[in-house]
Amino acid sequence: MKIDRERSIITLKIKLRGIIMYKFLLTKLDQDVYELFAHFFEQAVEREKLNVLAEKTNLSKRRIVLVFERALDLQKAYPYFEIALHEGREMTLYFAPNFLLSKLYSVMLAESMPFQILDRLFSDKYVSLEETAQQHYVSNRTVQRKLKEVETILENYHIRLNLKIKPLFVGEEYRIRHFFHIMYWQIYDATNVR
């Protein structure tokens, strides 16, 4: 009985860490895209009025329009859905038979700055703060804030980031391996259908 309880606690901690990473690595807009798609996917609806959708998803109509625009951008990288906004009052979202919500998440994750920073750090290909800012068309200060966010998530795994000396990741090796295993699993595993 005690062993089952300990396993449950460990499983819960792992799930919470995954949620924390999910919340951290995606922008707020991408999180909203994911939640909107999850609503359509899980409810098996194809058409929804914006005011009803706003109520069900806790997003404003204006935010839903931003989500729609972001979804159009994502459609170029992952074309397994059709999305349309009709007269600013109704949204339709059709999924192809091979659409995976987890794959959409992977596409958004691959584009996110925190993931790209962590990926470069992991592969020892990190470039300077200025180059990173130029690659993402943001200010140096924005990259610094993203690095702070990266440090925050690493702290959840008892890992520190030290850009001055190698190794860049400071912590117990099994924790570092576990963190990157989880991170890469989230982007490359397309079997987890929500």
Q: Which positions does each model-derived feature cover?
A:
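Inter-domain helical "communication" segments and dimerization helices
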Residues: 1-194
